A protein has these predicted regions:
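Alpha-helical transmembrane segments
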Residues: 2-29, 33, 190-202, 213-287
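Functional transmembrane core segments of multi-pass inner-membrane proteins
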Residues: 12, 125-234, 276-285
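Structural signal for the C-terminal ends of transmembrane alpha-helices
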Residues: 118, 140-144, 165-169, 241-246, ...
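Conserved small/polar residues in nucleotide/adenosyl-binding loops
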Residues: 288-294
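Short microdomains enriched in Cys/His and/or Lys/Arg
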Residues: 84-125
């Protein structure tokens, strides 16, 4: 590896900091944009006309501002991580505390981008996986905050996985990716309807189907079982912890998207083959242990 190549993760990680700053905007604004669109659609359906034109609100406009006092942030207050440290985690104008989640998301994005560069170097594969990581992180945070998995993110993630597979930028071929997308969607769809018929309740949303299909497109159908098992175990552990700490939301609902995303990150970092090997080893070990106990009993 050349001297420049050794520093690839650093340069790409710095780019990740910038993307992380933008992800904070996406995570906060996209759900609000969706709600505003739903309100407009409902008003149009009812034949209502808004009294005033709503101000422009999208991912670019208006500029970022303090949610407490409305202070518009200058460019030097928007520098990833450094601005938070320099301002000591408080708004420059009103001194209201700024959530540490903002720099943490920036750091997480930088770390994921650096891992991609470390693994694939400066290549189209790194570009593809950085896009995957950023989108998955945004989806996880939005779902945790709002229980929404926007089609504006899940569907592009799915199609990007198929395109990346066709271009040879992932570890799976297009056929395996296609089957992964189809199997991912249908499997959760069947579980959803089975649960609803048995209990009369909805155990998950359609966004979960699309996210699982997207993971199938990126990792192929063989990775679907390890991904769903890992996400289910993590979700169960966190759910139990929240229940005992009285941290569950009203109705006891926990969004499943963040746990699917966590399993997706694990598959990206360690590779789907290693996840499958760990799963098979665990199942094999449990079966062998059970067989030994039965033999001793006999």
């Amino acid at each position: 590896m050349t001297w420049f190549g050794v520093w690839d993760p650093v340069w790409v990680g710095l780019v990740g900091l910038l993307f992380g700053s933008f992800l904070n905007v996406v995570i906060y604004r996209l759900p609000k944009m969706m709600e505003a669109q739903w309100d407009r659609d409902c008003a149009e359906h009812l034949g209502q006309t808004p009294a005033t034109q709503a101000p422009t609100f999208n991912l670019m406009v208006p500029r970022s501002r303090c949610q407490a006092c409305g202070h518009t942030l200058s460019w030097y207050e928007n520098i990833p991580v450094l601005s938070y440290v320099a301002l000591r985690g408080r708004c420059k104008a009103c001194k209201t505390a700024i959530s540490p989640r903002y720099p943490l998301i920036e750091i997480a994005t930088a770390g994921l981008f650096a891992l991609c560069a470390q693994r694939w170097g400066i290549s189209f594969s790194t570009l593809a996986w950085c896009g995957f990581a950023a989108t998955l992180l945004a989806l996880a945070m939005i779902d945790w905050d709002t229980t929404l998995l926007p089609d504006d993110l899940t569907l592009p993630l799915l199609w990007a996985g198929l395109i990346a597979a066709a271009a040879g930028w992932t570890q799976v071929d297009l056929r395996t990716a296609l089957w992964g997308a189809v199997a991912g969607y249908l499997s959760l769809w069947l579980i959803y309807w089975g649960f609803k018929l048995l209990t009369g309740k909805e155990g998950m949303g359609y966004g979960d189907f699309k996210l699982y299909a997207a993971l199938g497109a990126w990792f192929g159908w063989p990775a679907l079982l390890p991904i769903i098992l890992i996400s289910s175990v993590i979700g169960a552990v966190i759910g139990i912890a929240l229940k005992f700490s009285s941290g569950l939301r009203e109705g006891g609902y926990i969004p499943f998207g963040p746990f699917l995303a966590g399993a997706g990150f694990a598959a990206m970092i360690w590779g789907p083959d290693r996840l499958q090997a760990v799963l098979l080893g665990w199942i094999g070990g449990r079966s062998e242990e059970r067989f030994s106990r039965n033999a001793e009993t006999d």
